Amino acid sequence: MNTPWTHTTVLLNEAVEALLSGSTAATGTYVDATFGRGGHARAILARLAPEGRLIAFDKDAEAVAEAARISDARFSIRHQGFRSLGELPDASVAGVLMDLGVSSPQIDNPVRGFSFRFDGPLDMRMDTTRGESVADWLATAELQQIAEVIRDYGEERFAVQIAKAIVARRQERGAISTTSELAELVAGTVKTREPGQNPATRTFQAFRIFINAELEELQQALEASLSVLQPGGRLAVISFHSLEDRIVKQFIARHSKEVYDRRAPFAAPKAMKLRALERIKPSDAEVHGNPRSRSAILRVAERTQEV
């Protein structure tokens, strides 16, 4: 089981196997687009040939510091979000791995403000060196915007009620500044309970996704992968909630079929850019050992010859 400040990599073997196409001595350049605490990266390096390369991305300074512990000339990391994937040369990469969401050390560190389980500043930024925190945003955000964020990114049916409570609290006692304050406010507003779920779960998810522009960055990174992947290169994406998975699923589906131009019905169709391969869920044993893996879905696709 996980303990605070540790991280168990989800779908470790399945993701690396899919990324490397079963190779035990891969020679190409691979990308770990979300380094986190390096579980996937270390497993990839263990299966790279001496001439292989691994480029990692992460916007979290703590993740970059962890990456500095890897002493391997084949490895490099960039302190950037994975939307910067497109800065790599076209058709230069043999595989891209994206492990979406928040790592256990981020969730379990009260200072980061990601979890309602710990009292801490209401921050939630992946990159604490830039941008505004959730607390800063809530101090001035309009009721309608707050409600839309909770509804769209948290899929919360009580979004309007929660937004009204946040604004009322701000007007009466000042803005919310801690995770406990937000969790208690939501618990007092949402009267129904989903079995096994804290009533603040959806609101915390919504604010984290919004403040980090996670879905927009995911869409940009997926599009960039089409450019940087070489023919036969693999795209492997692990998602943890329906919003992420829907984007990944639709992206792969959209690029896995020939496209016809309605304005030129007799013209040859544009070739598909991806070939969908697998959809993998964690085993029962993995979920038992790491409950945080239960919602994970790994989708795998392969770049076609069309570049």
From Swiss-Prot:
Function statement: Specifically methylates the N4 position of cytidine in position 1402 (C1402) of 16S rRNA.
HAMAP family, per database record: 16SrRNA_methyltr_H
Phylogenetic lineage: Bacteria, Pseudomonadati, Pseudomonadota, Betaproteobacteria, Burkholderiales
A GO cellular-component term linked to this record: cytoplasm
Localisation: Cytoplasm
Family: Belongs to the methyltransferase superfamily. RsmH family.
GO terms for MF: rRNA (cytosine-N4-)-methyltransferase activity
NCBIfam families: 16S rRNA (cytosine(1402)-N(4))-methyltransferase RsmH
BP-aspect Gene Ontology terms: rRNA base methylation
Name of a matching Pfam family: Methyltransf_5
Protein name in the entry: Ribosomal RNA small subunit methyltransferase H
InterPro entries, sorted: RsmH, SAM-dep_MeTrfase_MraW_recog, SAM-dependent_MTases_sf
Reactions listed under catalytic activity: cytidine(1402) in 16S rRNA + S-adenosyl-L-methionine = N(4)-methylcytidine(1402) in 16S rRNA + S-adenosyl-L-homocysteine + H(+)
Main location: cytoplasm
Residues that hold S-adenosyl-L-methionine according to the record: G38, G39, H40, D58, F82, D99, Q106
Enzyme's top EC category: transferase
EC number per UniProt: 2.1.1.199
The entry's keywords: Cytoplasm, Methyltransferase, rRNA processing, S-adenosyl-L-methionine, Transferase
